[in-house]
Every structure is written in C-alpha cells, then in structure tokens.
Amino acid sequence: MIDRYKHQQLRIGSVSPQQISAWATKIIPNGEIVGEVTKPYTFHYKTNKPEKDGLFCERIFGPIKSGICACGNYRVIGDEKEDPKFCEQCGVEFVGSRIRRYQMGYIKLTCPVTHVWYLKRLPSYIANLLDKPLKELEGLVYCDFSFARPITKKPTFLRLRGSFEYEIQSWKYSIPLFFTTQGFDIFRNREISTGAGAIREQLADLDLRIIIENSLVEWKQLGEEGPTGNEWEDRKIVRRKDFLVRRMELAKHFIRTNIEPEWMVLCLLPVLPPELRPIIQIEGGKLMSSDINELYRRVIYRNNTLTDLLTTSRSTPGELVMCQEKLVQEAVDTLLDNGIRGQPMRDGHNKVYKSFSDVIEGKEGRFRETLLGKRVDYSGRSVIVVGPSLSLHRCGLPREIAIELFQTFVIRGLIRQHLASNIGVAKSQIRENKPIVWEILQEVMQGHPVLLNRAPTLHRLGIQSFQPILVEGRTICLHPLVCKGFNADFDGDQMAVHVPLSLEAQAEARLLMFSHMNLLSPAIGDPISVPTQDMLIGLYVLTSGTRRGICANRYNPCNRKNYQNERIYETNYKYMKEPFFCNSYDAIGAYRQKRINLDSPLWLRWQLDQRVSASREVPIEVHYESFGTYHEIYAHYLIVRSIKKETFCVYIRTTVGHISFYREIEEAIQGFSQACSYDT
C-alpha cells in the first residue's frame, strides 16, 4: 500500500470481509462476478488444464499464458481494436499472465472461523478483549461448550438456566441431547450459540471505549487496596493489573487502527495467488505441489460437506453439524498455522505440512529471503577484521570494494578535473589503477559516510554509519568497541556496506547513525560500546605480570622461575636487577629496543602522593647509601628519603603494559576534557 507521503509500505493486520471481497472479486466484461473458489480441484488429469472454479481457475486468477484463454484463443494484449477483451466461451480475460502473481480469490465459509493467530498465539487477543480464560474460549470455538444467546428480552429456557459449562453434570449432558432431537433446529438456533459464531457475537457486542474506562477504573481500585499480606493474593493482584494494562493497550490499538474486533473471526478466507503456491512438473511427468494447495483443498472439502449438511439434509442431527464445523475450524487452523500449540498435521509420508505461517516466517521465509534479502546497487560485502588503530567512527574499506562503490563519484571527479574526456576514458584509468584515481577516491571518501549492516538487523544498532578510509587487503576493518551493537565478532562474520546517495540519507547517516553517537543501548540505556572478547583478552595480556610484588626477589628462592613458569635451581639462577626509569617514555623506548619485555617488572619514577607519604605500611627492606640517603622498599612502591627523612622521590613497581594502558586512558580523558571545554 502507499501512504499519504507516497511511501510504499506493507502492513499486516485484520481486514473486514468487505475488503477481502474487494481484493478477490472482479467483474468480467460480460458483467459476471468471479472470485469465489468453490471446488477443491487443481488441474484436470486428462487435459492438464486448470479446473473451472478450482484453486487454479483461469477465470478467477487470470490466464496461464499471456493473451491466451482456456480455449486456446489468442488476443493481442493492449490492442484496443481487439474486441471483446475476454473469451465469451470460457470467460477468461485476455491479459498478461503476471496477474496470477497478485490476483487473489476467496472461499466463502459456511460457518464463521476464528483466526488462529488471534486465538492461540500468546498473548491471545480474543481472550484479552473478552476477559475470559483461553481454555474456555477454545472449548467454545471447537464446539465443546455452548452458551445461551440472549437475543430476546423475554425469559427463555436457557437464559433461566444459564450457560452449559457452569451447570451441574446432569444439565450439561442432557440439554445438548434435548436440542439435537429432530425438529428442534429453529429452537436450537435461537436459544444457543457455539463455535466461532459465538465468539463473533461477543466481539461484535464489545464497546472498546467502555473496555478502556472499566479497565482503568479496576486498575485504580486494585492500586488503592495496597498489599494484603498474603503473598499469593498479592501476586494475583499484580498479574491482574498487568492484564488490565495489556487489555487497555490492545483496545487503544484497535481504535487507533480502525479495526473492528469481530474481524478476528473469518467469514471469507482469502486464497493466495496461484504463482505463490505453484504446481511444478518435474522429470518423469511427476508433479510437485506446494503444501498450501493441499491445505486449501482440505478446507474446501470440509466446507462443502458442511454446506451439503445444512442445505440438502434438513434432518441432519445437530451434533453432526457441530462436529463438521469443528473440522472446518481445524482445517483453517492448519492452513494458517500448522501445529500451533499442538501436534502438527502430516501427509502420507509423515512429513509435516508447511502452512502459511511457515512460508512467511523465519530466515527462509517470504519476507527475509525474497523481499528483504535482495542485492542492491552501491553495496558490497566482506569479512570483518579488527582495526586496532581506527577511531570509533571510522572503518577500513578495501581498495577493491571502495573503487566499486564510489566509481561513479571518481568518474565525475576525473571529468571535472579534466583528467578524462568522457566516461570511457575515466573507466579505463580506473582499470589501470593510476595513482590519480586513488587520490580522487580518497577525496571523495572524506566527505561521504558509508553504512555498515550485519544481518540479522534486530535493532537499530544493527546498522550504523562510519567514515571510510582505504586499507590494504580484502577485509573490512572495524573498531572492536562497536561489535556489541552489531552482535558481531571476528571469527568470520560478514558485514554489508552501503553508500547513502541522497542528501537526506547522508544527513541522517551523519546526524543519527554515526557509531560515536550511539554509545548507549536504546532499550535499557546501558553502555553499548564496551570492551568485549578480543579487547578483554588484549587488556589482560597487556596488564598481566608478576603480582607478588617485591617479595619475588633473590631472597626468596621459592620464586625463582622463568617466563615459562619453570623452576630454576641455584646453580642456573642469575639475579637480574630490576631497572629504574625516570619517565614512561624511557620505559617504552627500552621495550621497543627489546631491552625489557612487556611484562618485565621495573621501577618508574612517580609524582609524590600524600597518601603514600602518610601511609603506615612497614617497609619490607631498607637500603642505606654512603651519602646518608636510604631507600624504603615496599611491596609495590619505593621511597627515596634523605638523612632528615625528607622524601626525595617515589618509584612505583609496574610493567610496560601497565604504563601503555595508563597512557591510553590518560590521553582519552584529556581529549574528552578538551572537547568539553570547547563546548562550553
């Protein structure tokens, strides 16, 4: 459908019987109205042509071959001189065969049938609106229960006795037998109601606004009562309040979308276009048919049987009619959703029938596989790898992908700069990989964001925008902090890249979809850009090292171990003095020169800390020097004092990994502080 803003959209919901009839019926040029499928047949076994008024009827759904009717006559499509526009003998219009992809039909149900999605799926919409237990409604739908129909103001037999399901056992079993007696059909139809028709009557009598008002009043009353002291009663009250909220929201949704509650009970069953449920002939003359065709046939068979019972045989017992209505309800349930909360129906080979719900849902369903999974222009796909040097809002695009995505922009740049006379010359320069091509490509990419998407896109953070840069290789580089939003990891995951073309799309990508602007989860507000997986392992390796402090020295022979955690004996042990560094730059420089390892312990000069100088910790060792100064050695720091006990400097015991980690955090905080100062 197309909305008022001329946007194509798809809406799934309940529709009225009049709307179903408008979709499925059509008037052929002779004035005849067609659209109802009345026969459960598909193709004639001799002529191999669709049966009239069957599931593949050409009068209802259109010709199989464009411009050729069922009789074999041919007319030119669109030729106004050709008259008439349909075959007078078979009634088939001379139109294109593509009409069989969207022309629907319908089955006129003899008895109303509840839509299984609204009845059995949780939460049950019908049960919520009627405020009745689901088990009771299911018993009513499948003709296990009956209730009195209060259509007359005068007291009637059943209105005096009430509903069957609430009566004593003698009434429960004797009254149905009384009404099934021959000659009581009119009396039975007036007094009792059962099946989906009973549900439809109750839904039609609902006033949604009164439901909202009454539910709100009851919710307020339950809130004013307060806790009762009984845990079971309190939980019951909470569940009731939650139910009232759901009921009010459901009623508001029906009012907002102009949907009537009784539309959840079907009187007309739509029949899908035949091209969406095909019958294909394979080798050997065998036919392969969609399971939906068999399920439609089952519905038509049972519906026609019920029609015959009601029209031809007036002496049919009521119990037999109710049983046939139950079979029609079960057949429609199987067609719409086979096996919902029960045992699925199987064919002769013990294979489960694939219902309409199975066709449209899941990864291999009609929406995700056929409609949403289409390839589009200006898009690419590749494996993602970690880009540790990237900024949060950047991603690395391989040259091969980037030149294909931005080829039209590069061609325009070459022509504007008079480096190519036409499109053909520009394409040849791109194929030859001339240096000027990559320069123009980088200029184009600087002002153009790209969108990265990882399927399945379950929430809005599944697709985000990034500023692309060129990288070597054939993989997309991604900052590891954005992986949680995509639910991605670097074990072979693939991501799609798209180029926003219009100015509106580019503005949306820059203002709303950039990765550095989506740091919090839209669902619960927790940070979404947090270290995970590879980053956590890297941080652990970076900050790992000896945690025993100064105790692991030459005075403790039990701690003499190498980097492989192997014990070193007295004869082979050589004590390595831990180096001292005045600043972090010297320590990192020594690591780059391979004089020390990443996790080698060292002493780093640190700023004086009042908490250290005021600490009452007892030093492990004290080293005195000839000039009177001495070193107080603690577990994780060292203090140099004068002869007058004045503190000269402090050294902390750390590793190069800890220093690098600290510097990264310090630079990030300084950058954040500068950004805040610029904003103020």
UniProtKB/Swiss-Prot annotation:
PANTHER family: DNA-DIRECTED RNA POLYMERASE, DNA-DIRECTED RNA POLYMERASE SUBUNIT BETA
One of the GO BP terms on file: DNA-templated transcription
Cofactor names: Mg(2+); Zn(2+)
Protein name: DNA-directed RNA polymerase subunit beta'
First-listed, main subcellular location of the protein, grouped into a coarse class: plastid
Top-level EC class: transferase
Subunit structure: In plastids the minimal PEP RNA polymerase catalytic core is composed of four subunits: alpha, beta, beta', and beta''. When a (nuclear-encoded) sigma factor is associated with the core the holoenzyme is formed, which can initiate transcription.
Binding site for Zn(2+): C69, C71, C87, C90
Subcellular location, record wording: Plastid, Chloroplast
Similarity section: Belongs to the RNA polymerase beta' chain family. RpoC1 subfamily.
Gene responsible for this protein: rpoC1
Domain of life: Eukaryota
Entry function: DNA-dependent RNA polymerase catalyzes the transcription of DNA into RNA using the four ribonucleoside triphosphates as substrates.
Reaction equation(s) it catalyzes: RNA(n) + a ribonucleoside 5'-triphosphate = RNA(n+1) + diphosphate
Keyword DNA-binding: no
Statement: the UniProt record of this protein carries the keyword Chloroplast: yes
SUPFAM superfamilies per the UniProt record, alphabetical: beta and beta-prime subunits of DNA dependent RNA-polymerase
